[in-house]
Amino acid sequence: MRLLKPLVALPTYCLVLFIRGYQKWISPLLGPHCRFNPTCSSYAIQAINLHGSVKGSWLAVKRILKCHPLHSGGNDPVPEKLTHINHQHEK
């Protein structure tokens, strides 16, 4: 079981490393143009770290698709991670 944890974390680590590379080498060449706060790349890192590589990547893709001139942008934080709560019905 101890060996599985690093393997499960590997996709998350690789995705974050890729995004950090984009932030360091590509984004400065493009200039600041993201209409959202946090930026799309920061949002992607936060989403992947909070929700995991699959759901976090899906949230990041949805965010990037919203980043266009017809969308007003603004503050758009990563959604909180939902927890399952068992509700008991009172009698």
Swiss-Prot record:
One cellular component (GO) term of this entry: plasma membrane
Coiled-coil stretches noted in the UniProt entry, renumbered to this chain: none
SMART domains linked: Haemolytic (SM01234)
InterPro entries for this protein: Membr_insert_effic_factor_YidD
Claim: Endoplasmic reticulum is one of the keywords in the record: no
Superkingdom in the source lineage: Bacteria
Tagged with keyword Ribonucleoprotein: no
Compartments it resides in: Cell inner membrane
Residue spans of biased composition, Basic and acidic residues class: 78-91
Location of the region described as Disordered in the Swiss-Prot/TrEMBL record: 72-91
UniProt KW keywords: Cell inner membrane, Cell membrane, Membrane
Topology versus the membrane: Peripheral membrane protein
PANTHER family per the UniProt record, alphabetical: MEMBRANE PROTEIN INSERTION EFFICIENCY FACTOR-RELATED
Its job: Could be involved in insertion of integral membrane proteins into the membrane.
Similarity comment text for this entry: Belongs to the UPF0161 family.
Name of the protein in question: Putative membrane protein insertion efficiency factor
Annotated organism of origin: Pseudoalteromonas translucida (strain TAC 125)
